[in-house]
């Protein structure tokens, strides 16, 4: 497939007031659904037309919109998480019944710097095509709020799993770490630095499959380019973030991977302190110990990644071919796919999965005319949202997103490391980006 990156792969306009605002019903309920006519009323409405009509006329649906229980084509359920400047709620897409995660931001609290971070988050997610990276489906804007509609990972955070069940076994750690490594490699190959890699930002979709999410601190950085803002969670921060005025983004992500691996195999953090000042001192001194139960190959890998000097750290390719990871399969990036459905109406030569997506859209009542009228709206369109959800569903069904198979012990049989209990109820909060 040919990649068509929304906004040319660059940053979205950072001024919220210049983003195209829309009502939940897409321009007074008529832009996408069309005006009612006698002919329309005589035939059975398509699911798309019925939903669009209900959003204008059905008392229950209108009340849900008024009470904030519905936004666009999504019914909003309970809260499933919170971020630095947002809350995350579970949503149900009314046409496809797909569960989604909706990140909600209050526009009145978005200063210029936060708007830039949000723009980068959207841009980063749309440039990446990997089975272990959370997908962005749609951006919905109202007068007071912004909603990022994303893939839902219902298995919870890696942090929560380890905090409640204890450390992972080394075979399980290898399986999970291989997926994270592959995702981060894909980011770096696309010049994207995550800057907030941690167990709280790794999400389970099944017992053996994880996805990296929360690109709120991500940025585009060319090879060797120096950055000068502190982003992320202090326990995962590389020493150069405390020591130097500039840093190379790739090395900072690599360090965070080392901290993450340590946490996975031990159930504790390598650097622990009661205050940020003491934590900084510990990281700069490089003082940490690895428990004896950790195998020697894993021990050497952790030591090789957590090197104080950035250029002496193991690179991601070396980590992936390291003796501890030997024999572990790595997921591969997906072929770049179209982020906008316009190609479905422009050519008769479509691939099998594209034909299936188009057929499903037509079954829902989304026609070539709707798709043509949708051009230029990118992620800020319910048509695009439906398309991306269906495309992702087709790719999952065709095993383009395969789930690793591994026999794991039940949680009650696992070694519940006592040290992990200190993390129960505690989250590592990411700090706002600030100039070093």
From Swiss-Prot:
Which GO annotations describe the biological process of this protein? protein phosphorylation
Q: Which InterPro entries match?
A: Kinase-like_dom_sf, NIM1K_STKc, Prot_kinase_dom, Protein_kinase_ATP_BS, Ser/Thr_kinase_AS
Where's the Protein kinase domain? Answer: 74-325
Q: What is its EC number?
A: 2.7.11.1
Q: Which residues form the active site?
A: 196
Q: Which Pfam families match?
A: Pkinase (PF00069)
Residues with Phosphothreonine modification: 229
For activity, the cofactor(s) needed are: Mg(2+)
UniProt GO molecular function: ATP binding; magnesium ion binding; protein serine kinase activity; protein serine/threonine kinase activity
**What EC class is this?**
transferase
Q: Which reaction does this chain catalyze?
A: L-seryl-[protein] + ATP = O-phospho-L-seryl-[protein] + ADP + H(+); L-threonyl-[protein] + ATP = O-phospho-L-threonyl-[protein] + ADP + H(+)
Query: Which family does this protein fall into?
Result: Belongs to the protein kinase superfamily. CAMK Ser/Thr protein kinase family.
Name assigned to this protein? Serine/threonine-protein kinase NIM1
Q: Which organism is it from?
A: Mus musculus (Mouse)
Gene responsible for this protein: Nim1k
